[in-house]
Structure formats: structure tokens, C-alpha cells
């Protein structure tokens, strides 16, 4: 899509706020009204060999892109840097904003970056602990296939937790498809 988002909050520079994906469908997050809508940042962190970092929830077999919600007065870029470190253990560099994903629950600022240095221990919290989350280095095409498989396997699920995880996987799948389709990785 070539629509432009009117909000531009990363530093004072003009950045790419290309809307990658919009979904305002009626979903199942009524219990979360107090914390939505929220602002978040997420993205693709790619090594020089082409592999990317993903956050893997082993207990349910879910791959997700590193990212999460904005805290306090963070800029979207600061949020991505913090979340990337928390979920992957890596510091990141060469950070490029490529657009936004909007849905009824949040606006996610989408970035591409490179890891540097040695990975530190990750610090999962909440659902991340519950689902035995860990960081993996994987081929992006394989990650996309696994995301699509997860969506198909959970298509008929009716419990709220599975629906939420499937919805988040669909969002990340759209982001990764966009990145791969537009040759945005090195």
C-alpha cells in the first residue's frame, strides 16, 4: 500500500511511514480494552549470512518477530532497540524504519536492523516464560513457512489464548512477507 501515515515520531527526520498492513477486523480482544490501542515496535534483525533472529515460543511452536510495546516516552526506534535486546540478547545497528502495521489493537512501527556483538542472556517475562520462549537464528523463508503452518494449524481454534497467538502470528507473517517481497533484506 502506498498510503502515508500522518504521524511521524522517530527523531526529527522524515521517515518511511508506508502502511505495510492494515486490519481493523472485529477480533477477540475485548478483555484487553484497558491497554489498547497501544504503540509498539517490531522488526527483522538480519545477520550478514542472511539468517534472521526470531523469538520462538517452544511450548506452542510459534515464531514471532522481536518486538513489543512502547514504554514511557520512548520513540519507536528506542522501543525496537530495547525489545530487540530483551528478546534476542543482541544490540542492533543500521536500524531502518520501513513502515507501520495498523490494526484495531495497536500501531506497530516496523524496522530492519543488524545484530552486533555477542548475544547476552535474554530475559523473558509473562507469556514468554509460560510458553518457554527462546531466541533462534533461522532462514527467513523457513520462518515464513513455519508462521504459515502455525496459522493453518490454529485456524479452527476457539480458545482465546490460541486466537490471540494466531492473530499475532498473522501480523508478523504479513511483515515478513512484505520484507521478502520487497527485497528489503541484504
Summary of predicted features, one role per range:
Residues 70-93, 101-155, 186:
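Unchanged
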Residues 38-40, 60, 65, 106-108:
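Short connector loops at helix/strand junctions that flank enzyme active sites
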Residues 36-38, 47, 105-106, 128:
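A generic fold-level signal
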Residues 153-186:
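Charged phosphate-binding loop/patch that engages nucleotide di/tri-phosphates or the phosphate backbone
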Residues 2-42, 48:
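Acidic, metal-coordinating catalytic segment for phosphate/diphosphate chemistry
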Residues 47-86:
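Conserved Nudix-box catalytic region and its N-terminal flanking loop in Nudix hydrolases
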Residues 45-48, 113-115:
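Active-site beta-strand termini and strand-to-loop segments that position acidic
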